[in-house]
Amino acid sequence: MKVVPEKNAVRILWGRERGTRAMGAQRLLQELVEDKTRWMKWEGKRVELPDSPRSTFLLAFSPDRTLLASTHVNHNIYITEVKTGKCVHSLIGHRRTPWCVTFHPTISGLIASGCLDGEVRIWDLHGGSESWFTDSNNAIASLAFHPTAQLLLIATANEIHFWDWSRREPFAVVKTASEMERVRLVRFDPLGHYLLTAIVNPSNQQGDDEPEIPIDGTELSHYRQRALLQSQPVRRTPLLHNFLHMLSSRSSGIQVGEQSTVQDSATPSPPPPPPQPSTERPRTSAYIRLRQRVSYPTTVECCQHPGILCLCSRCAGTRVPSLLPHQDSVPPASARATTPSFSFVQTEPFHPPEQASSTQQDQGLLNRPSAFSTVQSSTAGNTLRNLSLGPTRRSLGGPLSSHPSRYHRELAPGLTGSEWTRTVLTLNSRSEVESMPPPRTSASSVSLLSVLRQQEGGSQASVYTSATEGRGFPSSGLATESDGGNGSSQNNSGSIRHELQCDLRRFFLEYDRLQELDQSLSGETPQTQQAQEMLNNNIESERPGPSHLPTPHSSENNSNLSRGHLNRCRACHNLLTFNNDTLRWERTTPNYSSGEASSSWHVSTTFEGMPPSGNQLPPLERTEGQMPSSSRLELSSSASSQEERTVGVAFNQETGHWERIYTQSSRSGTVSQEALHQDMPEESSEEDSLRRRLLESSLISLSRYDGAGSREHPIYPDPARLSPAAYYAQRMIQYLSRRDSIRQRSMRYQQNRLRSSTSSSSSDNQGPSVEGTDLEFEDFEDNGDRSRHRAPRNARMSAPSLGRFVPRRFLLPEYLPYAGIFHERGQPGLATHSSVNRVLAGAVIGDGQSAVASNIANTTYRLQWWDFTKFDLPEISNASVNVLVQNCKIYNDASCDISADGQLLAAFIPSSQRGFPDEGILAVYSLAPHNLGEMLYTKRFGPNAISVSLSPMGRYVMVGLASRRILLHPSTEHMVAQVFRLQQAHGGETSMRRVFNVLYPMPADQRRHVSINSARWLPEPGLGLAYGTNKGDLVICRPEALNSGIEYYWDQLSETVFTVHSSSRSSERPGTSRATWRTDRDMGLMNAIGLQPRNPTTSVTSQGTQTLALQLQNAETQTEREEEEPGAASSGPGEGEGSEYGGSGEDALSRIQRLMAEGGMTAVVQREQSTTMASMGGFGNNIIVSHRIHRSSQTGTESGAARTSSPQPSTSRGLPSEPGQLAERALSPRTASWDQPSTSGRELPQPALSSSSPVPIPVPLASNEGPTMHCNVTNNSHLPEGDGSNRGEAAGPSGEPQNR
């Protein structure tokens, strides 16, 4: 029977005995358990591990919550029983340290681990294991099991592999846009519906930093080459690439060119499923594909790297020598260059031709892939020929049959490093056509980009599939070379599958060489050049014959001219030429042909020669979550002129406006070779030249800069080196220049459109004109669009040299560039700040603290949230879609956590307040559909907060801390983690309240630091927690028993206790109602303000861990003036200092604020109290040394020391109401808090060690790297929100955070 939800635990238990069930009763009881156990005394117990490992890295729990797996530096994995704390299994076999480990969420006894040498192992605790190695032995950064599918995600370098461990190798892989964008974390939500990825954000400084994952010699050479580039491939190509060169894999029912999922070279292909209806999306889930692959017959099993030509006998047997066509007029050099084969080539970032070695130039022709597929259409039937100039593939989905009279030479428009990898294109007239989509590794998945048109008289028509991703320059290449007669091609019963991959570096390398070879041939047919120009311009009409074409004079001249086609795309008006002298892309000026005729898509005649097997044309559509990226190109061989025609409008997310899409229909017309090939002519006027350069900078959309990047840009200096005035002046110059250019082009727009509609075909042979250039960017906008585009385009540009893409580090005010070290805000310049942080990170990592170093370093990660309900492969190459958190810090899998109910995400994000080192913020985001990505809770920490774990009920969060300090004084306990209660959403620093610290029991003789690498809650509510340290310890902490007197405070957990205001206590003078006042203060105020009435102590606070809410307490709540209690008012740093002066009036506060603003070393001495402040304001590194000295406590420290209480035996804390214990000092992100005898930079020892010495302790600069260094051994969960977690964050008396 279901009853009304009950809130009373006693009634719930009573009703459960009677057999009634209340809604939410189980959750309420579990929450009650979590609340109860936080008051209990926690005891930590070390797990006895074999071999005494030196360090423990990562922890993972089994789905039945009984086993705990831990990875260690001795290359082993130990399995421990949670209940007994005994090690029951040792997994031995990794050659290097396992960096990640995870249990399968639903299959008991299945565990996966990945180590630093690139090996992934899946262990069965009942016996046996499977292993797989990455191709280049890159470290495995993260692993994630899908909860329901037999699927393991492997993050390594810049790739995510999808592996069904029943097969030998992963069946799919997706890549980021560049090698610098490494994948550091993958994580499924509890149901497997969503996938979380963490990927490195490229930045201007990243080229100067070493990669986080070790790289071998080959990768190092590529890495250095990228660092030398003055300009990288664009992040987002100009306007209409997203329309004309990217078709979503969600295209509806493309049965003519269905694309299949990536199949690795050593993995058999799945059987082709029957074609789906044309009304459905041809998307087959990865899980279904996994299952289908099991029974699929295969003839080849090879483990060769996909990017290397395999010479084994099995692979050699699969090569198709019969594909070599008979060549009549092509010399052997060209024949070798155009040998058709099937290729597997790993995508790589773009490298200009001049930076490649001569060996690569000699051998590149054999390795260059093709991104084109040619469809031969005739009356006899249709055959898809997939040709490429690369190593042969090892197996084919079916018999290959194609009988064209001539071979087809293809050079694909280059796909950047983020392009699809191993996409399969199939074309078949029968039902065996595979309908699997390509891996969605680019910003938008690629499908067959072609519109077929059958020629009259049975002549063959060529259809080209191209795809260009929004992150790279589009490139163009050669097309088909065929006879004009009817071909003898016939229908093929087996689908021909081609792995579409492109290596831009090799492509650019060999493009010019092939151009030289091809154009130097005397027997080149007119159709060859005709197809070449069609591809170079994508939708230019084909030229009728050689009589209309000027003959090139030399191969060198041809090479120079053809280089202009590397980025020539008539469809998107992006005419660029790579200048070898300046290493820059420059615009060229073509004169486009015009004609006066009606145009149409000719859809009805496209597939006339094909049987009705569900083949449909891809309709114009839009990609989900991004700008529309699908369109169709029509390539027709009919002799007709061309004319642009509007086919629709589409929304451009980049500009936020609707823009028109044009197509061209081919009629008669010719295009001159010079008009298509020649570079931009020199302009006589300097003003025009400047305008051209400004426009070039604006329109090319230079990418994020690696290495030298923007600071070596030929036109503009690094924005970080500009003063604010110069920076905004350049912005204004750019805006004015662009506005003027747009105004001029808008005036010419209608004129050129009219001229193009009335000019004859003979005008095509005229030379380029200025008007032709002006058509490049604005042809796709009408006058209204153009006026609306001006504001957003300029608004997105933070500096002229950055083009239309704005690095996000310039978007926020605190990240604006500054000139010099000091600025009016008192913050350092970006370059200085980055350099100092790198030095600090190097110093920290030299001390063995790589976790802290990774937080100090400038590298940040973006968290993206992918819908995996349909097993769609994530488009990780697109850095702008599904971004949940733009910048965060990731050290290992423990640096990010998803709650058990899948509703919360906890991660560390960099703070906007820069310092040395940068402080960080623990942020908890919502994963609920109604407020996805909304930041709910925040807390400031220093760079040594490296591990985060949400409690089983999602109401508490534990932060693991690293430390690199040496303990100067003996200590029996060391604070290694903090537990916070998620209290009030959107409450800023008050949204989380610290409830207790996790203390590590230390031997008395141990003086070295103790750091946590991973800390996790045990899966059951109230069961406890576990953590691993850098000493190799695995500790399980459990709540043992309630502390004495805690029940008295259980009913006082209401919000009224936590919101005690100083005004309500202003009349409570110490001594008026001594006993009552003492009790209330013990409950809500004493520890909150750092006041110890009987144990005066000297506290030193250097900002470094948690910034406090700006809150002042009344001085009368913390000042002891009774002579019988010397040193009764030892205030804590934090708001205690700020409230000290509350009784003295606002003048004291104003004075402190003024002195802190001035910076430098400042001392303020007043009657009965003194505050010493050290402020290095220019560097944002304020160190506060604060102590209060009572009049009668200045004679010595004996009396105070005699009254110290004995330490609690608990590993977490003692009873808060005991007056002998120290108040907790939670430190601000740059805070280090000591008690006098214990200068451990990490936390303070037991209260017994405290002293009432009034002498301040000097704080070294190095102390500001550890977050919370707590001296607290008490439970402070009952304190007001301004409790110990904020103790040290106030800037002393000023009441302001001193981290500015």
Swiss-Prot record:
Record-listed cross-link Glycyl lysine isopeptide (Lys-Gly) (interchain with G-Cter in ubiquitin), residues: K45
Record GO terms (molecular function): GTPase binding; protein phosphatase activator activity; protein phosphatase binding; ubiquitin protein ligase binding; ubiquitin-like ligase-substrate adaptor activity
LIR (motif): residue ranges: 1044-1053
Pfam families named in the record: WD40 (PF00400)
Chief place where the protein resides: endoplasmic reticulum
Keywords: Autophagy, Cell cycle, Cell junction, Cytoplasm, Cytoplasmic vesicle, Cytoskeleton, Developmental protein, Differentiation, Endoplasmic reticulum, Isopeptide bond, Methylation, Mitochondrion, Neurogenesis, Nucleus, Phosphoprotein, Repeat, Transcription, Transcription regulation, Ubl conjugation, Ubl conjugation pathway, WD repeat
Family: Belongs to the WD repeat AMBRA1 family.
Domain notes: The PxP motifs mediate interaction with the catalytic subunit of protein phosphatase 2A (PPP2CA).
Name this protein carries in UniProt: Activating molecule in BECN1-regulated autophagy protein 1
Gene name in the database record: Ambra1
